Amino acid sequence: MEHTHQYSWIIPFIPLPVPILLGVGLLLFPTVTKNLRRMWTFLSIFLLSIVMIFSLYLSIQQIFLSYIHQNVWSWAINNEFSFEFGYFIDPLTSIMSILITTVGILVLIYSDNNMSHDQGYLRFFAYMGFFNTSMLGLVTSSNLIQVYFFWELVGMCSYLLIGFWFTRPIPANACQKAFVTNRVGDFGLLLGILGLYWITGSFEFQDLFEIVNNLILNNRVNLLFLTLCAFLLFVGPIAKSAQFPLHVWLPDAMEGPTPISALIHAATMVAAGIFLVARLLPLFIVIPSIMYIISLIGIITVLLGATLALAQKDIKRGLAYSTMSQLGYMMLALGMGSYRSALFHLITHAYSKALLFLGSGSIIHSMEAIVGYSPDKSQNMILMGGLTKHVPITKTAFLVGTLSLCGIPPLACFWSKDEILNDSLLFSPIFAIIAYSTAGLTAFYMFRIYLLTFEGHLNTYFLNYSGKKSSSFYSISLWGKEEEQKLNRNFGLVPLLTMNNTKRVSFFGKKTYKISNNVTNQTFITVENFGLNTRTFYYPHESDNTILFPMLVLLLFTLFVGTIGIPFNQEGIDFDILSKLFTPSINLLHKNSQNFVDWYEFLQNVTFSVSIALFGIFIAYCLYKPFYSSLLNLTLLNSFKKWNSKRIGWEKLINFVYNWSYNRGYIDAFFKTSLTENIRRLAKQTNFFDKQIIDGITNGLGITSFFVGEVTKYIGGSRISSYLFLYLSYVLIFLRILFYF
């Protein structure tokens, strides 16, 4: 056992040869390196698989032998200061390593096909290999200096991957936005590290926790300064894990390739912030005010992310805001002191969200064959619809991921989210109300994404898209907003069934279009003609096996990974592997908990949360299920007429929510107005002052000296008469000055 741990330090460096060799090869032997592109893919997957097996072995050992292993080497800089570096292996490290490697391997397999058409294929795999190395180095670090080093490498890799298509202005701006936003968090993290070192004199986690505890117990530390340092440490995870108010970079990060969106949102960059808070929880837990701040930031992010996801039309941006909300749940759990629940949700969410992003990538890949390689079209859910019969495997995988994120049993996220919701009841009634309400919103917006994408009929070829519905048959907009047109009070099923089948009614316009005499009529949503050839209809097709295989593996994870934390221990049933792994575990809300509940208590706890999720799904189904395929919508439409007295207030509320969501809560606009524009204005003024004033003075003195020299040289000219003239001039000037003064 000890012999095995002696080689744990090599975990971060196993994937490193691939990016190094790719970089050298592309510089020195570009043709040969590009011809061997599949070899580099296989090598990347093979090396990451070795890390996964090693991490899995360590986790199995830790389940049966609860231990923490640390190995540190010291580098003496002088007699007063020495830098220690090493590796730290505990259950958190093992779990994170497994998470990073499993998701990373599947994303690499997926990327082999998804990125095959891209000229930067090898550059992408080099970045991915370095990204995995940086994240593995972060989770195995034994001290804050190593954490900060790999923390910066993770940020650099995300910058490179978000801006992978840097020749396009939008991705270039997105990666700069992510980089600058994370610099704010990184600066706070650095200040916090330096402040803690000033207090404790150590960077090592174990020493740090012990020294801080002793200082607080003996009242030998300034609590205000310690709280400030702890908060500065927390600023880093706020930015990295896209917590309010430093979340603004996350939706723009969707401008990168879809595989990297899956990796960032599942197991790397955003998970890094949650990991660091979990690692430093023994420090935060002795400072109650910091724990409350963590939970407050978490609950704000939970609600904000959910509300911002409501009106998104880009499928990846909708999933990005979903990630933001779920990260808020994890941060809330950590702030409440529910260590196990937070990490459990980190695990289940990682696999579910990776499945959803890879599923969205498969959808986008299929849509690109029709609308072209334009994110504004291929990622727009308005142009989708009716994909069930075209991409059935992708649809099934996406549905499972959606149900999991909604918290529907027995899928993965149900088990972890329900624990967090139950803990919120014990922590604060207000926080519990927000957390439970957001669970309903999550179910609503996730099923909205699913229904807009897969139900109905393909909307790509339809004309005159205006974003509004004026048909008297359909009064719900694409995000669920009721329009102002009046409905026929006596509208029923018979007129619908007797409509002319050779015509179709636009959901957005009153004009009708004849489809074909040979094609069965179907009711469509009309959308703008983007210059496509509408005479020949092409339909999306299912993706290749190398894209589907990772999705199916993630589907299995989504189905079964929740079993590792099922809190049942009755009649010989003992599923709770996670509690064994995290023994002893920090839990401020269940200090005397036995880490299991019986069936009756479990059913009591989950009934309410599942009911809220089902209600959210029901509302989404009512508003987004295609009109012609659901009799329920007829009842809904006829009921709108009865709401005339309340429609004005209802529409104002709907418009407010829509504008809030569509404009990203006005937070981006606030930052742009108060920070970005002012900084740019200051930069322009500074540039003007530097060039016109500072450089003007310097250049002016130089030019003046030059002309004075030239004039002097001309006047002198090696002629005696000129010298006499200058001499007499100086004498006269001197006498004049002397006479007056």
Swiss-Prot record:
Q: Name one Pfam family in it.
A: Proton_antipo_N
The annotated topology with respect to the bilayer is: Multi-pass membrane protein
Recorded GO MF terms: NADH dehydrogenase (ubiquinone) activity; quinone binding
Subcellular location(s): the record lists: Plastid, Chloroplast thylakoid membrane
Reactions accelerated catalytically: a plastoquinone + NADH + (n+1) H(+)(in) = a plastoquinol + NAD(+) + n H(+)(out); a plastoquinone + NADPH + (n+1) H(+)(in) = a plastoquinol + NADP(+) + n H(+)(out)
- Known partners and oligomeric status: NDH is composed of at least 16 different subunits, 5 of which are encoded in the nucleus.
State the function annotated in the UniProt record.
NDH shuttles electrons from NAD(P)H:plastoquinone, via FMN and iron-sulfur (Fe-S) centers, to quinones in the photosynthetic chain and possibly in a chloroplast respiratory chain. The immediate electron acceptor for the enzyme in this species is believed to be plastoquinone. Couples the redox reaction to proton translocation, and thus conserves the redox energy in a proton gradient.
Q: What name has this protein been given in UniProt?
A: NAD(P)H-quinone oxidoreductase subunit 5, chloroplastic
* Species assigned in the record: Arabis hirsuta (Hairy rock-cress)
Q: Which gene encodes it?
A: ndhF
